[in-house]
Amino acid sequence: MAPSAVGLLVFLLQAALALNPEDPNVCSHWESYAVTVQESYAHPFDQIYYTRCADILNWFKCTRHRISYKTAYRRGLRTMYRRRSQCCPGYYENGDFCIPLCTEECMHGRCVSPDTCHCEPGWGGPDCSSGCDSEHWGPHCSNRCQCQNGALCNPITGACVCAPGFRGWRCEELCAPGTHGKGCQLLCQCHHGASCDPRTGECLCAPGYTGVYCEELCPPGSHGAHCELRCPCQNGGTCHHITGECACPPGWTGAVCAQPCPPGTFGQNCSQDCPCHHGGQCDHVTGQCHCTAGYMGDRCQEECPFGTFGFLCSQRCDCHNGGQCSPATGACECEPGYKGPSCQERLCPEGLHGPGCTLPCPCDTENTISCHPVTGACTCQPGWSGHYCNESCPAGYYGNGCQLPCTCQNGADCHSITGSCTCAPGFMGEVCAVPCAAGTYGPNCSSVCSCSNGGTCSPVDGSCTCREGWQGLDCSLPCPSGTWGLNCNETCICANGAACSPFDGSCACTPGWLGDSCELPCPDGTFGLNCSEHCDCSHADGCDPVTGHCCCLAGWTGIRCDSTCPPGRWGPNCSVSCSCENGGSCSPEDGSCECAPGFRGPLCQRICPPGFYGHGCAQPCPLCVHSRGPCHHISGICECLPGFSGALCNQVCAGGHFGQDCAQLCSCANNGTCSPIDGSCQCFPGWIGKDCSQACPSGFWGSACFHTCSCHNGASCSAEDGACHCTPGWTGLFCTQRCPSAFFGKDCGHICQCQNGASCDHITGKCTCRTGFSGRHCEQRCAPGTFGYGCQQLCECMNNATCDHVTGTCYCSPGFKGIRCDQAALMMDELNPYTKISPALGAERHSVGAVTGIVLLLFLVVVLLGLFAWRRRRQKEKGRDLAPRVSYTPAMRMTSTDYSLSDLSQSSSHAQCFSNASYHTLACGGPATSQASTLDRNSPTKLSNKSLDRDTAGWTPYSYVNVLDSHFQISALEARYPPEDFYIELRHLSRHAEPHSPGTCGMDRRQNTYIMDKGFKDYMKESVCSSSTCSLNSSENPYATIKDPPILTCKLPESSYVEMKSPVHLGSPYTDVPSLSTSNKNIYEVGRCLT
């Protein structure tokens, strides 16, 4: 994006979020900033010229030099000013609005101005937290409430809002039995004889019951009234929920189940005897025996198995070398020749035995663990056997002493030490008991078979055993023609072109032949494949054994040689009528019936049996899925049940159709789904009715309108999902929240237009005006003569006194006093500040003092003029006024939203403006042609035939013109004012100028800011400050008001500029003049004014 576009976008975003200076809560202040400008100055240079002289050698022409000046330009810094908008004190910025800030939250109202709350009806106090107490109501809480039994009194109407459980006009009556709650509208739900509290509806349960509705028994561990009594039962005993009597669990007895069953008994009520032996103890609850050490079993009847001892026989004996272990203690009883706690110590050293340990052991040392120290018997290592441990385990045995039998199967080898199996080819598994899975063979079944066409694979070597009809190593080759059977070793014996099956050698005869080898022709009267068809010829000499074509006798024709007789006739001379029914035809010879498809019987009077159809009822029906029975007896078509279609009645009716053959159209509306069987509708959430055309009743939603809406304040809810559609003035998920402050209406989408601190109704947006204001938006003050809330109170002020529109306070006219200004008063300035006479009237009463002051002022002006003339002469001597004449040049382009200076040029008047460094007086001089005019509130100076242009009318009543450099000369200044007041702010920021001619029009600069306003109903009138000596002294009022700006003519000692600023509607709080053409400041460079 181009930089200019980025800048424009940033500016527009700032403008969109900026404060509106028109907002009454927006204040502004000026701030300075420096900009680089180009300014002109007089640059000296040496100019050579020629003149006539007496130099005869140069033909009377001499060269001369002189210092001349030309206009040059240089860059300099200039201080400029811009206005920054910000929220006034007591307000904070929220988006592009200034919102009032209340230190204390308005509890029942809204903040309308700093620390000022507008309370809702019935509330008061600084933070709207104080309402009428419970005993009073009405205006000023002056009426006493009549409500009883803790009822609330409406602070506005005094109506009693009964507490739950009471009724009546004054809430003096309790709810009727069986009812409770607010307005006694709720029915009690208590069970088991419980009573209901009329206030809360709380059930007062009978002893032994609890729960919200007393529907539950007391929880375990409690009983009695309110289930407050703790059960004394111990060890899991349960008490009666009413009496508290204990029912003990098995194994416990006593009043509180604190005593276990006596020894030798157990179970419920300790009624069972213990069955334990050998001193075993019985568990008093379950009866399980806890055996003593050395015994085990359900009844402790078994001694610990060999090699174990101790409690539950859980410990392993540690006796070696054949030592026996005590089943109770685990102590070892050693064999002769061994000693020690575990019998692990030999009496003879290793390798010796016999008396005196003198005989060497005869065992094979590599395969022997040890030899017996007494007998010298060898103890072999696992996998070895024999007297001297020199023989490996025999086949089928392994381990210590070769005592363990091998478990390997199917010819597998067993490892003599570990007993692990090495399987033969074709088997797998830990003991080689699992044959190879189909398709695998070899050691560990690791190879994959390659047999095809159902051939079986040998699990040993993978060789293929082919099925009948196949041959080859992988059974992929079919038997050659003429052979069949296993390995294709059999020869076919089929004749007459019959095909031989390669699997079993059976012959598939061609039509007209039969027999095992197809060597026999079809018998007379038959034909076709396997001679299964019978010839149907009348008056024929048989039929073709292959095709079945009839060989008719002479005189007969037709497919069956029966076309002689007409239809329906048979017998001699076709004299007998056929009796066949249902479209059957009869034989012309004997009248036998040939039934039409779908019928059977001698006269074709019966339909096909269920499950068959067609000619001769020979064709089986297809499998009809959802039908009324088998297929149609003629066509074989399935007769579908309502809701199904398709050749097999296995298709559900398409959407929108139902009934028999799916011929009926569904009538379900609003996305309801239709049953394909009977057309009944299953409605979409939000709809009910036979055809789903009825919306859910108000207050219900969802499927079958089952759910109840939770919306409040008159909101409607969506019949589909229960979403609330709030009425105007409400928001939130269930429409329980009022619109936020300053918003109202549908979806809180309207902004309140109330002014002057008025409150806005959150539903209608109607303004409730503060005291002293009226109008639709409370934009109007009370009309003269009225005041107060709604401007309904009449002022009681007398003698032309002014009435305050808010409080009704009277401001008396001169000469009166009192609350209603009905008392006469002395005309003295010191007595009444509201009746102080104007400065003009004081001047008339003290004319002598005024004349004296004027004489002194004129003398002072003469002295000042002399000083300025002397200073100006010195400046001319230094050559400061040699810069060429400079015309006004706008520093930037004016836009339709800014003000412009029209016909801005230099005046031909001789009047000059200057500034005095000592007395800070702004003055303009010229020949005196009119009387002096004091620029104050009562004596405005008028502008003659001039106006200030503004291109558009939509502007605010405040505008500023800043004189930021020295005084300047402006003529032909024209201003067209809108209907509002127009303010011009003059600021002097330059160095002092020198007077040019006598006669001054001065402004005192002890306050450097002056505001001139104009009532725009009148245009400016003529008044030229060029002939008289008029001054503005603002020491008495630093913001003296000038009804019309005067015409000022000036001579500028240096480059100056004029700044005109239009109000900002929605601009940035910092409006920078040199930035964009839409800026609200215009800067004009002002050149040196000439006389």
Curated annotation (Swiss-Prot):
Residues 23-100 form the EMI domain. One of its GO terms (biological process) is homotypic cell-cell adhesion. Residues 94-129, 142-172, 180-215, 223-258, 266-301, 314-344, 398-433, 441-476, 484-519, 570-605, 613-650, 658-693, 706-736, 749-779, 787-822 form the EGF-like domain. It is found in: Cell membrane; Basolateral cell membrane. The chain crosses the membrane at residues 848-868. Keywords: Cell membrane, Disulfide bond, EGF-like domain, Glycoprotein, Membrane, Repeat, Signal, Transmembrane, Transmembrane helix. Glycans are attached at residues 269, 530. Residues 19-847 are extracellular. The keyword Transmembrane applies. Disulfide bonds join 27-88, 53-62, 87-98, 102-117, 119-128, 145-153, 147-160, 162-171, 184-196, 190-203, 205-214, 227-239, 233-246, 248-257, 270-282, 276-289, 291-300, 317-325, 319-332, 334-343, 402-414, 408-421, 423-432, 445-457, 451-464, 466-475, 488-500, 494-507, 509-518, 574-586, 580-593, 595-604, 617-631, 621-638, 640-649, 662-674, 668-681, 683-692, 709-717, 711-724, 726-735, 752-760, 754-767, 769-778, 791-803, 797-810, 812-821. GO terms for molecular function: scavenger receptor activity. Its main location: membrane. It holds the Pfam family EGF_laminin. Residues 869-1091 are cytoplasmic. GO terms for cellular component: basolateral plasma membrane. It comes from the Eukaryota. It is a single-pass type I membrane protein. Residues 1-18 form the signal peptide. May regulate the mosaic spacing of specific neuron subtypes in the retina through homotypic retinal neuron repulsion. Mosaics provide a mechanism to distribute each cell type evenly across the retina, ensuring that all parts of the visual field have access to a full set of processing elements. Belongs to the MEGF family. Homomer. Does not interact with MEGF10. This is Multiple epidermal growth factor-like domains protein 11.
